[in-house]
Amino acid sequence: MAFLHKTPRIAPPPEGRTGILLINLGTPDDTGYFSVRRYLSEFLSDRRVIESPPLIWQPILQSIILTKRPFASGANYARIWHKEENASPLRVYTRRQAEGLAERLRADGVPVEWGMRYGCPSVAKAVESLMDQGCDRIISIALYPQYSATTTATANDQLFRALMRLRRQPAVLTVPSFPDHPAFIRALETSVQDTLAGLSFKPQQIVASFHGLPKTCIEKGDTYRDECERTISALRQALGLSEEQMPLTFQSRFGPLEWVQPYTAPFVKALPAQGITKIAVIMPGFMVDCLETLDEIGNELREEFMEAGGEEFALVPCLNDSKGAIDLLEDLSRSAMAGFQRG
């Protein structure tokens, strides 16, 4: 293995220095075919995401899926692209979360960097930046409230790949998932209440939609569904809602396998026939708005619901760079720092 021999610009102080690393999924650099193709190729080549043997999966991916899908995905990204910053909302809000957390921790001398599992800015560059600021301890927060091998674990994998190339490694602490952390539930509760207060109608249901996962992953031991249940149970309790008033569903199914159910789209399209024509949708598995929230739910599902006879549809925004989001990240960071003392 070739080691990186670059010496950090600043040596750690005698007492040591801790830095915070935020890791999110990733995004194409733009909406063009080749940018989207590069991103999808990296994402769909991850064995944590697609567990099929590469000898079987890669020919399908490279010759079929990546020939056509970048066009459709690029058009979808274009609908939600942040024009002022020329970036996807996921990148914009992840950066703003890092900036907000950095401001909270500035007086403590704790720098904050952010990186993407797929695409730019890379996790390796974020680690390098923290070490250049004299950090010999890094606290990593994967921005996924509920654990899954397809998200949290692969983010950690990427962090440790970056460390594999360093001759002098910093000490690292990875923060566990936080599906029912009090600050997370408070932030979700506030987001729902603020959204409902601004509506001209009262939703008959608030549908909770989480990103789906193949059922086989759960059967093999992934705790994702259980953690989604923990989130929604705590949120229902905070809002005083029943299971019927806030049902749990799963979106974004891909491929022929059976995924965890109920599936969001069929569930929502069936509601008008049951007399439920006014709904809101919240996506508590996403820390920031992205393609799956703004387009798949905010555009596509809205259209399908209206075509099925729906009358009113509201989207509860993700936490993004809200005060509640920064409060949560600060709480997670400070708790981790308190337990991560220099030896």
Curated annotation (Swiss-Prot):
Gene name in the database record: hemH
Reaction catalysed by this enzyme: heme b + 2 H(+) = protoporphyrin IX + Fe(2+)
Gene source species: Gluconobacter oxydans (strain 621H) (Gluconobacter suboxydans)
Main location: cytoplasm
GO cellular component, one term: cytoplasm
Residues that bind Fe cation: H211, E292
PROSITE patterns noted in UniProt: FERROCHELATASE (PS00534)
Keyword Transcription regulation carried by entry: no
GO function terms (MF aspect): ferrochelatase activity; metal ion binding
Annotated family: Belongs to the ferrochelatase family.
Origin superkingdom: Bacteria
Top enzyme category: lyase
Protein localization: Cytoplasm
Keywords, ordered alphabetically: Cytoplasm, Heme biosynthesis, Iron, Lyase, Metal-binding, Porphyrin biosynthesis
Enzyme Commission number, as recorded: 4.98.1.1
Involved pathway(s): Porphyrin-containing compound metabolism; protoheme biosynthesis; protoheme from protoporphyrin-IX: step 1/1
Described purpose of this protein according to its UniProt entry: Catalyzes the ferrous insertion into protoporphyrin IX.
Pfam family for this entry, one: Ferrochelatase
GO biological process: heme biosynthetic process
Entry protein name: Ferrochelatase
